[in-house]
């Protein structure tokens, strides 16, 4: 039986937490579906009791869009002073602190023993490539093949060309273990084309769909599409769901 190398927790939309051997990573948190019920709150991935004593907590925000960033993340320092923040340079904060690291496309940084490289996006901000505890993790942010039906043919071609150029650049990474990638239902019948292209070209060991809001049904459809390409894609049903890698 394969040893579990990471546990992935779906928070909401493009927000995920990943528990590796020695680290706890959070990507693109903007809200978490919980009620005021105390028992329910304790099921929350980011309930204070769950992370207050954790060491090596790294919080990533790929850009300043309201569905990828919430300044609430800085409140977590009140109950865990070990948190490190890795933020796209388009994110503005009131006061910089020693535990804030800002990064832009093509930059590479080591934050303690975690390697981070910023790749580009087809929207604002960046995508993240993270190497930690022997794993290589990619979070796309808003990098996607944004094929909107209402766009002109010329605009659609620009979107395709830009997207494929970013994926070509990412191919310099020879092996990605876990990748998080958008499957946005607003794109209608074209929701899957970016994820399918990404999967075929990059070949991650595990492909985790994101950026679908409340439309969890779309992850099942996407997983079925990816089966035809021999890429393992995850079906997500509910917030707080645990995925083992």
Annotate each predicted stretch with a short phrase.
Residues 2-3, 82-135, 230-245:
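Metallo-beta-lactamase
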Residues 7-10, 25-28, 115-120, 136-142, ...:
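Active-site-proximal beta-strand elements of phosphoester/diester hydrolases
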Residues 9-11, 24, 99-108, 191-245:
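Binuclear metal-ion centers of metallo-dependent hydrolases, dominated by the metallo-beta-lactamase
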Residues 13-14, 33-34, 64-69, 91-95, ...:
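Active-site environment of divalent metal-dependent phosphoester hydrolases
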Residues 17-60, 71-76, 143-172:
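Pre-active-site segment of Zn-dependent metallo-hydrolases
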Residues 26-28, 55-67, 85-89, 138-141, ...:
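Active-site neighborhood of phospho(di)ester-bond hydrolases with catalytic His/Asp-centered motifs
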Residues 46-108:
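Active-site HxH/HxHxD metal-binding segment of metal-dependent hydrolases
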Residues 122-200:
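Active-site-proximal loop/helix segments of hydrolase catalytic cores
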């Amino acid at each position: 039986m394969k040893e579990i190398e990471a546990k992935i927790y779906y928070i909401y939309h493009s927000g995920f937490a990943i528990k590796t051997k020695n680290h706890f990573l959070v990507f693109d948190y903007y809200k978490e579906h919980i009620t005021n019920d105390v028992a329910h709150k304790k099921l929350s991935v980011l309930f204070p009791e769950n992370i207050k004593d954790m060491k090596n907590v790294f919080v990533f925000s790929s850009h300043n869009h309201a569905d990828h960033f919430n300044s609430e993340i800085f409140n977590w320092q009140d109950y865990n002073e070990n948190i490190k923040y890795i933020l796209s340079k388009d994110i503005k904060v009131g006061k910089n602190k020693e535990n804030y690291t800002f990064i832009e496309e093509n930059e590479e940084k080591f934050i303690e023993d975690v390697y981070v490289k910023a790749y580009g996006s087809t929207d604002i901000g960046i995508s993240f490539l993270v190497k930690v505890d022997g794993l290589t993790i990619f979070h796309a942010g808003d990098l996607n093949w944004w094929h909107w039906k209402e766009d002109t043919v010329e605009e659609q071609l620009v979107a395709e060309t830009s997207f494929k150029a970013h994926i070509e650049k990412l191919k310099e990474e020879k092996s990605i273990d876990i990748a998080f990638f958008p499957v946005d239902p607003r794109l209608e019948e074209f929701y899957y084309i970016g994820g399918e292209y990404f999967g075929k070209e990059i070949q991650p060991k595990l492909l985790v769909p994101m950026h679908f809001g409340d439309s969890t049904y779309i992850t099942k459809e996407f997983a079925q599409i990816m089966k035809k390409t021999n890429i393992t894609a995850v079906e997500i049903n509910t917030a707080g769901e645990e995925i083992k890698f």
